[in-house]
Swiss-Prot record:
UvrD-like helicase ATP-binding domain boundaries: 37-503
Keywords carried by this UniProt record: ATP-binding, DNA damage, DNA repair, DNA-binding, Exonuclease, Helicase, Hydrolase, Isomerase, Nuclease, Nucleotide-binding
NCBIfam families, sorted: addA_Gpos (TIGR02785)
Subunit structure: Heterodimer of AddA and AddB/RexB.
Biological-process GO terms, alphabetical: double-strand break repair via homologous recombination
Protein name as it appears in the record: ATP-dependent helicase/nuclease subunit A
Function statement: The heterodimer acts as both an ATP-dependent DNA helicase and an ATP-dependent, dual-direction single-stranded exonuclease. Recognizes the chi site generating a DNA molecule suitable for the initiation of homologous recombination. The AddA nuclease domain is required for chi fragment generation; this subunit has the helicase and 3' -> 5' nuclease activities.
SUPFAM superfamilies membership: P-loop containing nucleoside triphosphate hydrolases, Restriction endonuclease-like
UvrD-like helicase C-terminal domain span: 532-816
GO molecular function: 3'-5' DNA helicase activity; 3'-5' exonuclease activity; ATP binding; ATP hydrolysis activity; double-stranded DNA binding
Enzyme Commission number(s): 3.1.-.-, 5.6.2.4
Catalyzed chemical reaction(s): Couples ATP hydrolysis with the unwinding of duplex DNA by translocating in the 3'-5' direction; ATP + H2O = ADP + phosphate + H(+)
Organism: Streptococcus suis (strain 05ZYH33)
């Protein structure tokens, strides 16, 4: 019997799950109810369907989170425990929000129900919510491996390898060693040939290394990397000569026939309708000859067909390439049009026949050389296998793993241990997953292993799958969708189409674009009635014509600054941003729109700085979610890194000169030149030593002042170098800050707070680096240098940001959010197609497709010893086409996500020359959709939308184009923000007469007299908290150690006033965050840095407050005696326990209720261990012990009364010092 049946077979009789007929009854009742916001029939079905796999396809804004919460709540009300549900979310933040919603609904249900048994059950679920399996798949697999990793020999004391620079460093070390081993054993030169194939003429192995990383990373997204590499990566038959011959004889023959039949129809039409007017022309005889060649095609094989093609091309090449061109000069307009149409059609046909000829030539050539690539491919696969194993061995040795490793360990544990797998399959009543469209194959395998085969609940929307770069595979969702659609016995498919977010103008525009853009061929799904958005409430259907979607196009009238070249990059321009600024000013001034309701979406953060500078010019507040990572390039950090480089190695000339010129030492160009001239060769440090002794080639250039400056520098540097040998990098950095006042110096510069935050973060990152197990300045510098060399900069430090401001974020960041006004910026930006030019393209199904560097010396008459030609193998070409469709489909989904963020109004923003754009698009369409060839050939959102506008110009597309020129963007026409007026001072003449004021003052005086008379009773609250009691007793407690001064002596200090607008973080804020963190911390598993940070992520506090919490100190607490006792007795643990106690005030003898929340206690049979967290700053622990003695005594008395236990041991956990301290309080 599984856990579900055991729980439901208890004493309490829970309601049974609804049958299909009962669900229909609920749907009918809901439809006829008078609710203002009714649940849809599909939402009800998704909430109550039970006993089978369910896939919910939830369109944007359809309330999928509402459905999930309601479904979970329904299961809890029917006797299922929260611990019997496995709920996977895409992000930690989403998990926290889901828990909050469940908690809120549970509290509401508990308050409403009168059934005491149900209340007890739901209260138990509320208490267990923090321990429930609601989180990311990564967090679950981490817990699973911590608990059961012993079965694979994995220590539970592992850490997560999250730092990209550390990962890159480890991978490089493993690769270099393996590369050297392979090179040493390469007797026949096969490995050198492999490396040359991917590195070309470069002298290093970087090209080959990137290929190895690429294949390795792809394999990690599969459920079994080793199995995929061995069984799928190399598919030898795809590289065989037989495969090309088969393609030429079968598939390609049909392609050639199709083109020739099209040509026959075209030329035959021209002969029939043009004989009378052009029959005597020279080209006409050539056309008739071509028609003769286009007869009897069915009986020809592929080789004969290509001979016909070649003969047609030869005929066309006559008369200098005009053999089939109508060169006549008719005067009749109809004949002119007929001639031009013929010439254009003929040119396209000849071009397509040439392409066919080239394709056949390349395939024939490939047939001889492609097979030579197979041994290299096998060797590449073997190298990647060895690299993957060696890399994993290093991570095992370091006890540091990537999330992908943890996922694969978890899969192995469940696959190889039937008892563990059975435990989880029996434990979970249902396996639920949110954002199912973004699952990868490793996560899908985990869900399969946790499920019993008929208890999966999956929610997602394939149209919002935008994480292919993380190896998410939307086809996992689509295959389930099609399976359940075709065979309901396999599972239930439920469509949530109603959108409850956007007004009808947004929905209609989105549908109009996507019904004409997305289908199975390009888009991977057909956007039809199944996927179209429908307004979910009557209010959304009320038309607001002014909110029709607008396509704002910055008209680049200067043709020299505009281009419609498909290959030319189109960066965001100042003109486009001015267009948006102008509209935002209008929205704010005329429609009263708040800045916080407006969001700008971009595809990349590359141009965030430009956007923010222009908005700042117009006074528009704006907040960005981050720019291009440039932390290591910030000037203050670069100077400190150069300082560390010099400390590590004074012979580093570049770093040394940078340090000398820095504000810390201020050597100028003249002084540096004088030093440099003291010796012709050698390092600059050596020249400084020579200059100091005035023994160089030009001692006359050295003044006493300069020599002293050099002496001071060398002395400081020697001192720093000696200090660095004995202390941590963190201490070294702060020593430099303090001795040279550099931290204070940058604080006085523009953006000083940001610069100081950067320096502070450098110290923290150095400290974090040393906690990973790595030690030493040289290794830290090497890690930083590798990060810079690999363009792996660190994230910028965030500052406090204004609340009422326009938001600027990427489309990816906006997913799941909603905003009243949305501007999609730079839609003429080209898609990122870099992966189309890789030397290896990978398909999950077809394996590796590679480019092969063939030696064609035998085909080419050349004096050179080798003639190497880079060939795209057939598998490479097939994988490239698959990749192109996948990338274009992803871009369509990205556009869909962007458009569906808007609630009220949507703006698209692009640019181009109006005249050129009008001529660019051909208007081709097929079956109500933009022509496939058109969609495949385009590489911007703008091209797609304007091509739709051209192809379907006679239809209502629910958006309007607005061209904006520079003349529309003058300072006068843009306008200025109208700020809200300040409150004007009140005038006495506008208020009541003076006698009324006098009467009011008399009444207030009498009230004051009464207040003074009964002050004691008035100030006694009926409810008090322990903190209030503590404050009451504090003056008395502190008197014992009080010294009375004869005379007041003010402290002679001067503190600069704080002019920053950033609110200070108070101790109370940090304390509240710490308390919430300790409440959220899951103590049922091993407490690690990752579990603490995961809990910290869910804490409701500003990031700046969270940054003040010392995670290491939290970890250190669980290494104390009390911490270990708590972990060993979680069954006796009570956290955040509310209490109430009746007390008597010692002054007024009035009764009052003391209420509070105890941080935590362990309840034993004969005694209680009480503990409380304190984040106060202190010099000696006894200070806090005395300060909180009275408060702890109140807690202890309340517990004694509640449990009838006399012994309560009290402890304060002090988190406000330099290290963790646990102090026992005597009461």
């Amino acid at each position: 019997m599984d856990g579900t049946n055991e729980r439901r077979s208890g004493l309490m009789a829970f309601e049974q799950f609804l049958s299909a007929e009962e669900i229909k009854a609920v749907q009918l009742a809901e439809a006829h109810s008078d609710k203002q916001q009714k649940r849809t029939a599909e939402q009800i079905e998704a909430i109550y369907t039970h006993g089978q796999n369910v896939l919910v396809s939830a369109s944007a804004g359809s309330g999928k989170t509402f459905v999930m919460v309601q479904r979970i709540l329904d299961k809890l009300k029917r006797g299922i425990g929260i611990d019997q549900l496995f709920i996977s979310t895409f992000t930690v933040k989403a998990a926290g929000e889901l828990k909050e919603r469940i908690e809120k609904k549970l509290n509401e249900t508990i308050a409403e129900t009168t059934d005491m048994e149900l209340r007890r059950h739901l209260s138990a679920q509320l208490a267990d919510l923090t321990k429930a399996d609601i989180g990311t798949m990564d967090s679950f697999t981490q817990k699973l491996v911590t608990t059961y990793g012993y079965s694979l020999g994995i220590s539970p004391q592992f850490r997560i390898l999250q730092d990209e620079t550390e990962k890159a460093s480890l991978k490089k070390e493993v690769f270099d060693q393996l590369f050297a081993d392979y090179l040493e054993e390469d007797e026949n030169g096969a490995f050198r040939k492999l490396v040359r194939n991917f590195s070309g003429n470069r002298k290093d192995n970087s090209g080959f290394r990137q290929v190895v990383y690429q294949v390795h990373d792809f394999s990690q997204s599969t459920s079994s990397p080793t199995k995929w590499l061995k069984e799928q990566a190399v598919q030898a038959d795809l590289y065989s000569q037989e495969r090309i011959e088969q393609m030429l004889e079968q598939g390609f023959k049909e392609k050639v026939l199709d083109k020739l039949y099209q040509a026959a129809d075209f030329f035959r039409y021209h002969v029939e309708w043009g004989r009378n007017d052009f029959g005597s022309a020279k080209y006409f005889a050539n056309v008739e000859e071509v028609l003769d060649l286009l007869t009897g095609l069915d009986s020809l094989d592929q080789k004969d067909l290509m001979e016909r093609v070649e003969r047609i091309l030869l005929i066309n090449n006559q008369s200098r390439g005009k053999g089939l061109t109508n060169a006549n000069r008719p005067k009749d307009e109809h004949l002119i049009a007929f001639k031009e149409e013929y010439n254009a059609g003929k040119s396209q046909i000849i071009s397509e026949l040439r392409d066919l000829g080239q394709e056949v030539y390349e395939l024939t050539l490939l047939k001889d050389y492609q097979v030579q690539a197979l041994p290299l491919l096998i060797l590449l696969r073997d190298f990647v296998l060895d690299f993957s194993q060696a890399y994993l061995d290093v991570k095992i040795k370091e006890a540091a793993f990537e999330f992908g490793d943890i996922g694969h360990f978890a899969i192995r544990i469940l696959e190889e241990n039937a008892d563990i797998r059975q435990f989880f399959q029996e434990k979970y009543h249902e396996v639920m997953v949110d954002e199912y469209q973004d699952n990868n194959h490793s996560q899908e395998r985990m869900l399969d292993l946790l499920s019993n085969g008929h208890n999966r609940f999956m929610v997602g929307d394939i149209k919002q799958s935008i994480y292919r770069f993380r190896q998410a595979d939307p086809m996992i969702f689509q295959e389930k969708f099609e399976l359940y659609q075709a065979n309901p016995q396999s599972g239930k498919l439920i469509l949530l189409k109603e959108n409850f977010r956007s007004q009808i103008e947004v929905l209609e525009a989105t549908n109009a674009i996507f019904t004409r853009l997305m289908d199975r061929q390009v888009g991977e799904i057909k956007y039809d009635d199944t996927h179209s958005l429908v307004a979910g409430s009557p209010g959304q259907k009320i038309a607001q014509p002014k909110n029709e979607m607008e396509y704002l196009i910055y008209d680049q009238q200067d043709s020299a600054n505009s281009s419609t070249d498909a290959e030319e990059e189109t960066p965001l321009t100042a003109g486009e941003i001015e267009v948006v600024a102008k509209e935002i000013i209008r929205l704010h001034n005329e429609e009263g729109a708040d800045f916080k309701d407006i969001t700008l979406l971009v595809q990349k953060r590359t141009h965030n700085d430009l956007i923010m500078s222009i908005f700042e010019k117009h006074g528009i507040p704006i907040v960005a979610d981050g720019g291009a990572a440039s932390y290591l390039q910030s000037l203050e950090v670069m100077i400190m890194l150069d300082t560390l480089r010099v400390i590590n190695n004074p012979l580093n000339d570049y770093a040394l000169v940078a340090l000398l010129k820095s504000p810390m030492f201020r050597f100028d160009e003249d002084e540096l030149t004088r030093i440099s001239l003291q010796a012709g060769t050698g390092f600059f440090y050596q020249k400084m030593e020579i200059a100091q002794q005035a023994s160089g080639q030009h001692p006359e250039l050295m003044s006493e002042k300069l020599k002293k400056k050099i002496t001071d520098f060398l002395s400081i540097l020697e001192n720093w170098r000696a200090y660095a040998k004995l202390h941590s990098i963190y201490d070294m950095i702060w020593k430099m800050f303090n001795e040279k006042f550099y931290y204070d110096y940058v604080g006085a510069l523009p953006n000083g707070s940001k610069r100081q935050a950067n320096l502070y973060a450098l110290g923290l990152r150095a400290n974090q680096f040393e906690k990973t197990g790595y030690k030493g300045l040289s290794r830290f510098i090497a890690m930083i240098d590798r990060a810079l060399a690999n363009d792996k900069d660190l994230a910028d430090v965030q500052e406090f940001l204004p609340q009422n401001a326009v938001q600027l974020m990427t489309i990816h960041k906006s997913k799941g959010l909603e905003f009243k006004y949305v501007f999609l910026m730079n839609i003429d930006k080209r898609f990122n197609l870099e992966d189309h030019y890789q030397s290896v393209i990978i398909s999950r199904k077809n394996g590796l497709g590679i480019q092969y560097l063939a030696d064609m010396k035998d085909k080419v008459n050349s004096p050179l010893p080798q003639v190497r030609v880079l060939m795209n193998t057939l598998p490479y070409q097939n994988n490239l086409q698959e990749l192109k469709i996948a990338n274009l489909s992803e871009q369509m989904r990205l556009l869909y996500v962007a458009l569906t963020r808007a609630e009220k109004k949507l703006y698209l923003v692009g640019k181009g020359n109006a005249d050129k754009l009008a001529e660019k698009y051909d208007g081709k369409k097929e079956n109500g959709v933009l022509a496939q060839s058109t969609r495949e050939s385009m590489a911007t959102f703008q091209d797609w939308i304007l091509a739709i506008d051209e192809a379907f110009s006679g239809e209502d597309l629910h958006f309007k184009k607005v061209f904006v020129t520079d003349e529309d963007l003058t300072e006068e026409k843009i306008g200025k923000l109208t700020l809200k007026s300040k409150l004007e001072d009140a005038s006495l003449k506008d208020i009541r007469q003076s006698e009324d004021i006098a009467q009011a003052l008399d009444q207030l005086s009498s009230v004051q007299e009464l207040n003074e008379r009964y002050k004691a009773a008035i100030e006694l609250p009926s409810l008090r908290t322990p903190s209030q009691i503590k404050k009451l007793y504090e003056p008395i407690l502190e008197q014992e150690g009080m010294e009375v001064m004869e005379k007041y002596q003010p402290k002679r200090t001067f503190n600069l006033p704080d002019f920053s607008k950033k609110p200070k973080i108070t101790g109370a804020q940090v304390g509240s965050a710490v308390h919430e963190l300790m409440q959220r911390l899951d103590l049922s598993w091993l407490v690690t840095e990752d579990t603490v940070r995961a809990a910290l992520e869910a804490v409701h506090a500003e990031q700046a407050i969270k940054d003040k919490i010392n995670v290491q100190m939290i970890l250190d607490f669980f290494d104390t005696d009390l911490g270990r006792e708590i972990l060993a007795n979680t069954d006796k643990l009570h956290r955040e326990a509310p209490f109430a106690s009746l007390q008597t005030d010692s002054v007024s003898q009035e009764n009052f209720v003391l209420r509070g929340i105890i941080d935590g206690y362990l309840l034993y049979d004969d005694h209680i261990v009480l503990f409380d967290y304190k984040t106060d700053k202190y010099d000696q622990p006894i200070q806090l012990s005395q300060r909180y003695q009275a408060q702890m005594q109140l807690y202890a008395e309340a517990l004694k009364k509640a449990y009838k236990i006399d012994r309560v041991d009290c402890h304060l956990i002090l988190l406000g010092g330099e290290r963790i301290e646990v102090v026992e309080v005597n009461i």
